[in-house]
Amino acid sequence: MKKLFTMLTMAMMALTFTSCEDEYIADTLEGTWTGNMYISSEWDGRYYDATSTEVTFLRDPFTYTSGTGYWVDYYSNAPWDYVANHIDWNVSNGVIRVYFCEEGTRIEIRSFRLNHNRFVGTIYDSGNLVDFELYNVSRPYSYWDDYRWGYDSWYDDYYYWARTRSGDADSTKVIEKPKRVVRPALK
C-alpha cells in the first residue's frame, strides 16, 4: 500500500510541475507581426527577396497552442507585389511549426525570443537556416484595440496571386506562381 501511495504521489507531483510554456508562447504569439523574415521567392529561374513580411497568428480558442492565420511577403523588384498564404500553426515543445496552406510547405521556428513587442529567431526549412526579426503591430483583446477601424478589403482577396506588372504581359498566358524559399545569407 505504501508503494502505491508513493507512486501516486510521484504522479501527482509530475502533473503539478508540468510546464505551460507552449500555451504562453501561443498566447504571446497571437496578433499581427511585421518586419523582415529574409524570405525569397524563386520564379522563372530568378530569385526575388521580400522587402518585408506581415504574419498574423490567430489562436484557436479550443486548443490553446495552435491556430490559423495569414503570411504575406511583400516585394519591390519582382513581377508581383506580394505573395499571400493562409497558414496553420502550432507550438509543441517550444517549437513553432507553420504550414503554408496554398503552397503545401512547412517551416519551423526554433531558437527564438518572444515578448509582446518583439519576435526574433531562426527559421528552419529543409536544412536552410535564416534569422528574422518581427515587431508586433496589433494584438487582439488589448484595451486600446477593441475596435475594427474602417473596412479592409485585404482579407477578401488573399487567395489570389498578384498579376504581373509589366505592360507587355500576355493576359492569356498562364503565370506560374512563385515558390517560397529560405536562402542562407550571402557572406
Where are these regions (language model features)?
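Positively charged n-region of N-terminal signal peptides that target proteins for export
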Residues: 1-4, 187
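Sec-dependent signal peptide hydrophobic core
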Residues: 5-12
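C-terminal motif of bacterial Sec signal peptides marking the signal peptidase cleavage site
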Residues: 15-19
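N-terminal helix-cap/turn-to-beta initiation motif at the start of protein domains
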Residues: 20-34
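Transition segment at domain starts
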Residues: 32-38, 43-52
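Generic short beta-strand segments
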Residues: 34-41, 66-74, 122-126
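N-terminal glycine/threonine-rich, aromatic-flanked beta-hairpin/loop signature
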Residues: 46-95, 179
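Beta-sheet ligand-binding and adhesion/scaffold domains
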Residues: 95-187
